[in-house]
Amino acid sequence: YLAETRNFDGTAVVIFQPAEEGGGGGREMVADGMMERFGIQEVYGMHNMPGIPVGTFAIRPGAMMAAADQFDVTVTGKGGHAAKPHDCVDSVLVAAQIVVALQSIASRNVDALKEVVVSVCTVATESDSYNVIPQSVTLKGTVRTLDPKVQDFVEDRIKAVVTGIAGALGATAEIDYRRGYPVTMNAEGPTGHAAEVARQIAGDCDMGVAPMMGAEDFSFMLNERPGAYI
């Protein structure tokens, strides 16, 4: 369009997106003053999406992709021989109870109409023995939400579940909960504009696509300027 329209009234800034996968490059660029430096008034991003028909676009106003947080939990018990569990505080048992109980947050604590994912993705100990109960177990996981209030609530519940179960079973637990990418939030006006452009190109644009629980550091840019992610 810009090549064909030489009298384009405005400035188009093409943004290279470094460190998107976990590095939070978008956050660093915003903090470095990118929006002010280049006079950016609206911001748009585009991503491929396996699963939708080839040659079509999809977008929605509001929450497009989830906020992504991370947590590390260290459960500490009392190690010992597996043949004498009564002389130990079994950190593996405590960690297993925590993993199961964390799933009650989504199923029993959060409104069923509010999207939330709590996934424990790593369970590790310092031992690879068949007959030694380890002193400690480490859990690592992620939380995905589409609503800031739900995000706050889930963080509080995770901390309560982890410390409560550990204490009830005679162990201790430390939790490091870190906020990551915010919700990718499409503004109403720019979303409609992006959809219209998509229709001109492809003839169709699905504006009823469901939000996705993946995360995107383009969200940091949308927190600074109105825009849309398609």
Map each language-model feature to its residues.
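Histidine/acidic-residue-rich, glycine-tolerant segments that coordinate divalent metal ions
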Residues: 2-134, 215-216
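Metal-dependent amide/peptide-bond hydrolase catalytic core
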Residues: 93-230
